[in-house]
């Protein structure tokens, strides 16, 4: 990836990290832990602390996962950066998808460093069925992964 094109993706990454950071800050300042605030019929704000990974995997462990996930996150972030440096300018969708994943990984890493857990608050639901509670960083990672899967599916 040429240096002059870095700034576009760096701005996207910083924007997502900033929105993620301040949305979590707002939740911390306005909702108590486990407090729920209805936004509209399929969306609640629900303040939870995730001590594990995606879908609360490992959250029931006795604390070792905190250090494991911290180190794992750093390794993933460094690997993504290394991969992105090798991209060519024409790989715009790839660069964007990895930028979204990188931004989400950094956003959640900031939480792990600051609090020892990740702040989740987006509760999508239909009647009594609730999807796993997530945050902006998680959503960014999800969209980036969908883009990669879609690109790989249609190129195979």
Curated annotation (Swiss-Prot):
PROSITE patterns: SPASE_II (PS00855). It is found in: Cell inner membrane. It catalyses: Release of signal peptides from bacterial membrane prolipoproteins. Hydrolyzes -Xaa-Yaa-Zaa-|-(S,diacylglyceryl)Cys-, in which Xaa is hydrophobic (preferably Leu), and Yaa (Ala or Ser) and Zaa (Gly or Ala) have small, neutral side chains. It is a multi-pass membrane protein. One of its GO terms (biological process) is proteolysis. Keywords: Aspartyl protease, Cell inner membrane, Cell membrane, Hydrolase, Membrane, Protease, Transmembrane, Transmembrane helix. GO terms for molecular function: aspartic-type endopeptidase activity. One of its GO terms (cellular component) is plasma membrane. Its EC number is 3.4.23.36. Its main location: membrane. Pathway: Protein modification; lipoprotein biosynthesis (signal peptide cleavage). It holds the Pfam family Peptidase_A8. The chain crosses the membrane at residues 8-28, 39-59, 67-87, 99-119, 129-149. The active site is at 120, 138. PANTHER family: LIPOPROTEIN SIGNAL PEPTIDASE. This protein specifically catalyzes the removal of signal peptides from prolipoproteins. Belongs to the peptidase A8 family. This is Lipoprotein signal peptidase.
